[in-house]
């Protein structure tokens, strides 16, 4: 027999944690499984236990409140666990996860997916050099360990995260060589009406930019990194001006640095929902391919709910509220007496979504941006495949990401295609003169996360193996 519960939740970020707290408050036996050591997700990531004290930030304050709420609730939090397979057995969900090097499983009547997002980083010549890190990875490093990516850093990318990362680097004592962003000042001005729904966050963003400008840090608007150079590590970055479609235009500028942070928006981590049979649709304003789900997390499959960035990139504030809505709806599906109607919560979710979607809109790369990916740029890091390798597959007839994967192994490495498949889809769309929404996402396959053979085999003695007798002569 395996342990069973009413509600199982994958992910303990703003969405998953609040879904769990809400479901538990309605009397449901609730279990949250999360990869991290502490709840909070990326946005509210906890400091390392080795750090005894640190200046308080809004993220630390909100994260600590969340962790206290979880500790005071009746839910069970399973930390440092990676879900690698989900199955449906009769009327119950069965979740297989790796913890302490072994595969365990639990059963649940209802499943809530709060799997969050992954960062899209467009490949650039030199992006595999030591010293290059994603914007999201840099925030994790700084929030958890209070460490800067390097001594002198170029921060490059789209949307608001470049300004947050640059501000945090300065706060922690690092040097920002420059900020390089494809966005223009006009892009930000056009987004202002939607950002007015969260004046507090808008004000905070203004403070970031003002502090950076007062510190004399150059901001290269409507620019992008063209190449990262160095023999064994980052030594310099070439940046170039962009046209309105973000294609390179004009001469390159050289910036000396020993580290680079780069990122180009977020995408819903929808592999688990697709694996379970949820249809996805292309919504550029939500980051690309997203699962079909209602505002309260309800899906077409009974007993399956999705919330947070895994349902579309609307930002942490919206994810927190949608988690509460999904937790209520999940509790209602088990305990009919639960009142799941909450108009005030729904209206708050819609307001927060407008702000988050405005930020997503600023983060989405435009069509000309991929011209920065040269033929000799590594696209698939796991298999060391270049853009020219991908285009060779397309020329032989591969018109989908699945076909490119079959012919080249792109996406078959440890990351499961999370680094390369979006870029490959963009390359296919460009070569076939199609819109990206015409290029279906790759078909997800188990395991959802890398899993070792030893974890699956469990503990056994070689003497227990049944060895057949030698065949008679």
Label the predicted regions:
Residues 1-408, 414, 418-473:
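Residues forming the flavin
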């Amino acid at each position: 027999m395996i342990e069973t519960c009413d509600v199982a939740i994958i992910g303990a970020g703003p969405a998953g944690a609040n879904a769990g707290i809400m479901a538990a408050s309605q009397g449901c036996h609730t279990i949250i499984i999360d990869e991290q050591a502490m709840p909070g997700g990326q946005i509210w990531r906890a400091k390392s236990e080795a750090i005894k004290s640190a200046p308080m930030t809004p993220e630390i304050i909100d994260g600590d409140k969340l962790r206290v709420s979880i500790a005071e609730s009746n839910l069970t939090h399973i930390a440092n666990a990676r879900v690698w397979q989900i199955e449906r057995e009769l009327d119950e969900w069965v979740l297989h996860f790796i913890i302490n090097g072994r595969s365990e499983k639990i059963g649940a009547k209802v499943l809530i997916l709060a799997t969050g997002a992954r960062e899209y980083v467009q490949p650039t010549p030199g992006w595999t050099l030591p010293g290059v890190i994603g914007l999201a990875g840099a925030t994790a490093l700084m929030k958890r360990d209070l460490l800067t990516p390097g001594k002198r850093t170029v921060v490059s990318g789209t949307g608001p995260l470049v300004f947050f990362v640059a501000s945090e680097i300065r706060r922690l004592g690092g040097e920002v060589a420059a900020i390089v962003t494809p966005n223009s000042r006009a892009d930000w001005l056009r987004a202002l009406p939607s950002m007015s729904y969260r004046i507090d966050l808008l004000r905070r963003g203004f403070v970031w930019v003002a502090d950076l400008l007062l510190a004399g840090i150059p901001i290269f608007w409507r620019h992008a990194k063209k190449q990262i150079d160095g023999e064994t590590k980052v030594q310099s970055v070439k940046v170039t001006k962009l046209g309105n479609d973000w294609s390179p235009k004009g001469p390159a500028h050289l910036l000396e640095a020993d580290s680079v942070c780069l990122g180009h928006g977020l995408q819903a981590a929808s592999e688990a929902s697709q694996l379970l049979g949820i249809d996805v649709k292309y919504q550029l304003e939500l980051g690309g391919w997203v699962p079909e789900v209602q505002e309260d997390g309800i899906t077409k499959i009974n007993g399956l709910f999705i919330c947070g960035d895994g349902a579309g990139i609307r930002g942490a504030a919206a994810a927190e509220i949608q988690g509460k809505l999904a937790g209520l709806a999940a509790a209602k599906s088990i305990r009919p007496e639960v009142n799941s109607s909450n108009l005030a919560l729904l209206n708050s979710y819609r307001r927060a979504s407008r702000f988050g979607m405005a930020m997503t809109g600023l983060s989405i790369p435009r069509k000309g941006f991929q011209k920065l990916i040269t033929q000799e740029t590594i696209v698939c890091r796991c298999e060391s495949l270049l853009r020219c390798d991908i285009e060779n597959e397309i020329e032989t007839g591969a018109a989908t990401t699945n076909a490119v994967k079959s012919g080249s192994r792109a996406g078959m490495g440890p990351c499961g295609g999370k680094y390369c498949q979006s870029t490959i889809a963009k390359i296919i769309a460009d070569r076939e003169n199609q819109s990206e929404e015409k290029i279906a996402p790759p078909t997800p396959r188990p395991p959802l996360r890398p899993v070792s053979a030893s974890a699956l085999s469990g503990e056994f003695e070689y003497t227990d193996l049944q060895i057949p007798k030698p065949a008679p002569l």
